[in-house]
């Protein structure tokens, strides 16, 4: 085989390899684009779901329900509330572990922004022993109050997620928010908004 034929074969091999590589790269980019678009659609659905929940429960008024502190002292929800609004965080041992980790982690990060005496943490679980063990696992440097009975029954039961809301002595739900771990910037925006609205 002459030198020219060797060169021609080599060039054809290089072109074939380069063409295959470029096709694979284009296919990879197309797959990534489709994946990102899919993520974007999921995020939109999550945000719309959050907005619809906020609208559905806006101004919902809780009956005054009993709570218990870590020392076993019983009190009513209204005893923790004041005329000025407080941030209420409700969490359950039945919530998904990654949701708990994300939400509690974010709550810890805003303790230097929102006064601790303006935060009420309500913990729900099955039985006093489980409640105490679950509360201890959160490592929150805040007073925790256990639910006695089923105060939140029928309120975001199906969602089974931690949530926040603002409330006062009127016991009305305002600015309800369900953190979405897939969209952390949404949670950041919520806390920035309520900090500016209520605590600055």
Annotated model-derived regions:
Residues 134-167:
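Short, internal strand/loop/helix patches
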Residues 93-99, 126-128, 180-182:
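Short acidic, S/G/P-rich loop/turn micro-motifs used as interaction or catalytic elements
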Residues 5-25:
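Hydrophobic membrane-insertion alpha-helices, especially the h-region
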Residues 100-137:
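Structural microenvironment flanking redox-active thiols in thiol-disulfide oxidoreductases
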Residues 166-200:
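Thiol-/selenol-based redox modules, centered on thioredoxin-like
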Residues 89, 120-122, 166:
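Structural beta-sheet core signal
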